[in-house]
C-alpha cells in the first residue's frame, strides 16, 4: 500500500519514480543511493536498513541539503525529514490492550537486528505500559534473535533459516510455560510465533498481537494489531519531498 501510494503521488506531482531495493544490506543501500544520484534524481525517499549506524551516503545527503525523506525509521540527530508512526505511543497502547485483559507474562518478540530508533520506541512504549500498571517487563521472557524476517537472511537462507527460527521458538515456548501472550514488533514475526504455538496446541491459549497486518481484499487480520496508515505515509512523504525539491529547506517530522 505504501509503495503504491508513493507511485500515485509521484504521478500527481509530475514526477517519475525509480525503485531500488537494498534487501536489508547497508552496502546495497549505499550503492543504491550512489547509483540514483549518478542518474540525476531530484530527491530520494528511503526506508533505511536496520543498523545502529547510519549510512555515510545518507549523512552526506543531509550535509549537502539534498532533498530526502525517510519513512519507517527516524534518524535521530540528523536533519532529514521523516514521515511515520508514533511507535512509542502505538506500542504502549498495544501493550495496554493485553494488560487490560489480564495478561502479565508477555513475550516481546523482535528480530535479530540493531535497535533502530523505531524498534527502541516500540520497546520503550511496551515498558512504559508495564510501568503504568506498576509492573516490570521481564526481559528474560523476550525472544530477540529471530533472523528469518530480515531481508538478508530471507534472501539467502530462506526456508532453512525459517526452520531454525521455528525450532528455536518452540524450544523457548516449552522452556517458559509461564508466558501467557506474545507481542511481535512486526506481522511476519507474529505469523512465525503463531505457527509455533499451533504446533504445540497453544494457539487458543496465548494471544498474539503485532504491528501491521496482512493486506487482503476484505481487510481481515489474524491478530489484534496496530494498523499504520501506509497510504497516507507514502503520499505525504512524496508531498514533503516535492516541497524540498522546490526549495523548502524546513526539516519536517510527521507522526
Where does each model-flagged region fall?
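Short acidic capping loops at alpha-helix termini that bridge into adjacent secondary structure
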Residues: 105, 137-140, 201-208
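Short beta-strand elements in bilobed, periplasmic/extracellular small-molecule ligand-binding domains
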Residues: 11-21, 127-160
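Alpha-helix capping/helix-boundary segments
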Residues: 51, 114, 122, 188-190
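Secondary-structure junction motif
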Residues: 108-128, 149-153
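Hydrophobic alpha-helical segments within soluble ligand-binding/sensing domains
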Residues: 81-108, 124-128, 162-170, 190, ...
Amino acid at each position: 500500500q505504501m509503495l503504491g501510494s508513493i507511485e500515485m503521488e509521484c504521478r500527481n506531482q509530475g514526477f517519475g519514480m525509480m525503485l531500488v531495493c537494498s534487501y536489508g544490506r547497508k552496502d546495497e543501500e549505499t550503492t543504491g543511493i550512489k547509483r540514483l544520484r549518478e542518474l540525476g534524481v531530484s530527491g530520494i525517499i528511503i526506508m533505511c536498513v536496520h543498523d545502529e549506524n547510519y549510512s555515510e551516503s545518507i549523512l552526506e545527503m543531509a550535509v549537502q541539503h539534498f532533498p530526502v525523506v525517510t519513512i519507517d525509521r527516524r534518524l535521530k540527530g540528523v536533519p532529514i525529514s521523516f514521515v511515520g508512526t508514533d511507535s512509542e505511543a502505538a506500542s504502549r497502547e498495544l501493550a495496554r490492550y493485553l494488560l487490560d485483559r489480564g495478561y502479565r507474562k508477555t513475550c516481546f518478540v523482535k528480530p535479530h537486528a540493531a535497535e533502530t530508533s523505531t524498534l527502541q520506541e516500540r520497546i520503550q512504549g511496551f515498558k512504559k505500559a508495564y510501568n503504568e500498571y506498576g509492573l516490570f517487563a521481564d526481559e528474560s521472557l523476550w525472544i530477540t534473535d529471530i533472523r528469518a524476517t530480515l531481508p538478508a537472511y530471507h534472501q539467502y537462507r530462506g526456508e532453512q533459516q525459517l526452520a531454525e527460527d521455528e525450532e528455536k521458538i518452540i524450544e523457548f515456548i516449552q522452556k517458559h510455560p509461564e508466558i501467557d501472550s506474545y507481542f511481535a514488533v512486526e506481522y511476519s514475526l507474529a505469523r512465525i510465533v503463531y505457527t509455533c504455538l499451533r504446533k504445540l496446541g497453544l494457539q487458543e491459549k496465548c494471544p498474539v498481537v503485532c504491528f501491521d497486518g496482512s493486506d487482503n481484499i476484505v481487510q481481515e487480520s489474524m491478530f489484534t494489531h496496530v494498523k499504520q496508515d501506509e497510504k497516507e505515509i507514502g503520499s505525504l512523504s512524496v508531498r514533503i519531498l516535492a516541497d524540498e525539491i522546490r526549495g523548502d529547506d524546513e526539516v519536517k517530522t510527521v507522526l
